[in-house]
């Protein structure tokens, strides 16, 4: 049995070099409007939860804050990594949530996957607080999607934020600029911060930093994932086969791993948005 996989990644070297960026250049840049902003805003209705997924560093927090800033009404922004947020939401009762969110029309929770039982808590909030809207972001689908899935059936919409699309980038450049940057973007991708660096070396270093500091962090924290080197080796192998059919058995033989372990690792990589699976077409 074979499957197609598409991977976005960088060179898997272990050396990570601190980066220096021209912050004046960043501050002077006009913000690139994300196409999802209008879609999320349109669907953001009372008693509904907008779930925004995406890999780390693709701009979920910025997009969430842009949506909050443009909202005409009372808003509240919480950080799911803040222990105070856990304390506030810990007592899952109608009286507590009515007290906390009285008058709030838009509740935004960043990195919501860190909050225990987030799905049932969001369900209670939208069911019992008339007029409230919720937007929650998550850097992996391990907790947020699994916990929020069943409790929020019929109450939520899910969105996947990717690095900048060419459509988004083209809005601020001429066709000639787009043509000149095409090869660079095909090689280094379009993570928001990558587009700010001037040299290829800086882009490579930043991508390496993302891989080791962010993208694989969630995977290696999962119980049972002990051999990080095997994970890196698997990523190298499928990176060489981007857009081609891959065999679980063949990958397992090359890595001295069982087929089940290969499938499990690939499933985990997909859940943190390191790879995208493209199913084959059968006649």
Residue map of PLM features:
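Conserved catalytic/switch belt of AAA+ P-loop NTPases
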Residues: 119-142, 150-151
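Hydrophobic positions on the alpha1 helix immediately C-terminal to the Walker A/P-loop
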Residues: 63, 67
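Conserved lysine of the Walker
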Residues: 60
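Accessory nucleic acid-recognition modules appended to NTPase machines
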Residues: 200-283
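N-terminal pre-Walker A segment at the start of P-loop NTPase domains
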Residues: 8-41
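Hydrophobic anchor at the beta1->P-loop junction of P-loop NTPases
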Residues: 52
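Short glycine-rich substrate-engagement loop in P-loop NTPases that contacts/grips substrate
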Residues: 76-106
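Short regulatory helix/loop adjacent to the ATP-binding pocket of P-loop NTPases
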Residues: 142-158, 173
């Amino acid at each position: 049995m074979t499957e197609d996989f598409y991977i976005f990644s960088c060179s898997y070297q272990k050396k990570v070099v601190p980066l220096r960026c021209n912050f004046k250049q960043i501050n002077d840049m006009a913000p690139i409007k994300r196409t999802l902003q209008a879609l999320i805003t349109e669907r953001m209705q009372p008693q509904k939860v907008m779930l925004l997924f995406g890999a780390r560093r693709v701009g979920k927090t910025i997009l969430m804050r842009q949506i909050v800033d443009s909202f005409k009404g009372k808003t509240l922004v919480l950080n799911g990594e803040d222990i105070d947020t856990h304390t506030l939401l810990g007592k899952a009762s109608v009286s507590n949530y009515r007290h906390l969110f009285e008058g709030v029309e838009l509740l935004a929770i960043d990195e919501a996957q860190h909050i225990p039982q987030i799905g049932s808590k969001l369900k209670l909030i939208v069911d019992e607080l008339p007029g409230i809207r919720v937007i929650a972001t998550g850097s992996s689908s391990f907790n947020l999607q699994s916990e929020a899935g069943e409790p929020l059936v019929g109450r939520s919409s899910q969105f996947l934020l990717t690095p900048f699309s060419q459509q988004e980038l083209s809005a601020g450049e001429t066709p000639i600029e787009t043509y000149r940057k095409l090869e660079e973007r095909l090689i280094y991708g379009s993570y928001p911060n990558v587009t700010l660096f001037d040299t290829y070396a800086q882009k490579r270093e930043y991508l390496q930093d993302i891989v080791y500091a962010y993208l694989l962090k969630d995977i290696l924290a999962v119980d049972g994932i002990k051999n990080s080197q095997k994970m890196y080796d698997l990523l190298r192998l499928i990176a060489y086969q981007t857009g081609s059919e891959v065999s679980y058995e063949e990958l397992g033989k090359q890595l001295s791993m069982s087929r089940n372990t290969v499938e499990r690792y690939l499933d985990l990589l997909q859940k943190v948005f390191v790879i995208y699976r493209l199913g084959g077409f059968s006649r």
